[in-house]
């Protein structure tokens, strides 16, 4: 919707301190979204189950792929079967409706409150200081006031797959002392002969 309506903005998770890139490059390319701001939020994961359930009863855990990956140590410790769902809140809702005490969800404390679930264990993420970078994105192009501070610039470019193509494209940044904080590649649709690159400088 944010690609069609200027009044609607999207907040998208871009990368995580523990698991790395989450993957928003296709959104920027497919929907021609512009990045306005970045925000870093601490992420706390919690194991939720039905009221009265116990951790030693749990056999299956449901959540978003990122939440599962960021809680892998806990999952291995309790030998839980992972089940990937679209999002964490939806996983909590599924547990509340399923009525099976062997199933659990990794989600927020707010989800536990909304869906009347038991918090079986708080802060199960691998990294105590787990942080995710979010991007505020939208349709319109906004020109920042460059005299009011430092800014990060994100941009896309495309190269054919041939020797030294990437080196030639990026050497100018090195020669001029420009620091690249992100460089990510993904293939052009239906082709591996050319690639798009997403950069932050």
Protein language model features and the residues they cover:
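Domain-level signature for soluble enzymes in the chorismate/prephenate branch of the shikimate pathway
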Residues: 1-201
């Amino acid at each position: 919707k944010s690609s069609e309506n200027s009044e609607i903005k999207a907040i998208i998770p871009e990368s995580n301190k523990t698991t790395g890139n989450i993957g928003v490059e296709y959104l920027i390319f497919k929907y021609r979204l512009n990045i306005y701001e970045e925000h870093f939020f601490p992420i706390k994961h919690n194991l939720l189950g039905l009221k009265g359930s116990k951790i030693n009863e749990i056999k299956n855990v449901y959540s978003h792929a990122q939440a599962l990956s960021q809680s892998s140590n806990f999952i291995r410790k309790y030998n839980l079967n992972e089940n990937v769902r679209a999002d964490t809140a939806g996983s909590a809702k599924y547990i509340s409706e399923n009525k099976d005490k062997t199933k659990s969800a990794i989600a927020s404390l707010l989800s536990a409150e909304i869906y009347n679930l038991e918090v079986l264990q708080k802060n199960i993420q691998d990294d105590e200081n787990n942080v995710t970078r979010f991007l505020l994105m939208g349709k319109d192009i906004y020109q920042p006031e460059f005299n009011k501070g430092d800014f990060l610039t994100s941009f896309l470019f495309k190269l054919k797959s041939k020797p030294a193509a990437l080196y030639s494209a990026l050497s100018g940044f090195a020669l001029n002392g420009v620091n690249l904080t992100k460089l990510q590649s993904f293939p052009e649709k239906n082709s591996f002969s050319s690639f798009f690159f997403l950069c932050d400088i």
